[in-house]
Amino acid sequence: MFGVSAGSENREEYFAGLARRFASDAKMFRCRAAVHVENKDDVVFWSTVLKHFCPDDRFHFLAGSRNEFGHETSGVTQCLKYVHALGPDFFICIDSDYRYLLHERGIDAKHFILQTYTYSFENHHCYAEGLDEVCSRIAHVPNRLFDFKRFLTCFSRIVYELFIWHLYFLRTDPVRFSKYDFNQYINMTSRESLISVCDNGHRVLEELEMKVKRKLAYFERKYPNAALENIRKKYEQMGLLPETTYLFLRGHNVYD
């Protein structure tokens, strides 16, 4: 019988019971541990990561599980319901979203939670240094049509300062420049701005830069005393630089 009563203790015990069962299943399958990921699309990515660091071990992956109401559920919220039941035999792997940048407590390997550090696993697939290799492997010819590294570096530099403002407002006034608003500003998939291979995306980057500069000018006029330099230094230590911004943005904005 699935489902539990409303009390938080009952919910914790319910998920602790599932965790024990998953760990037991992993042992039965002769795996080192059971691993709950957000959904089935994440399995390949995390399987590759764990294979790299634990080449001699096998893992039992779960792309979803039953929530407290008995419904089969996936996603990061479902993963995080197990936080009180994690250990070396059962752990979770999630997309960081902004959890890494905003120092969300308890989201680390010490608490048996692995994260992407980038916004999501899609950002890793967009890593500039590897895209040429992917194209060459698929097309069986060297990629000389589009310079991914140059495009993503230019894109990152254009949106970097706006992203700093976005992170600033997430701390001080989240409604002022929300995730939705920011993602709309950096969106490059409009019909009027199709990326051209011929000019290495120059036109779409120009249009994006004009849009971003207008928003930056508004923020600078409206909030002249915003202390951004400390924020830049703080995030620089975490790997957020003008050239690497694309790794920390919403993955689908970059991936699409």
Give the residues covered by each predicted segment.
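Acidic, divalent-metal-binding catalytic cores of TOPRIM
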Residues: 1-256
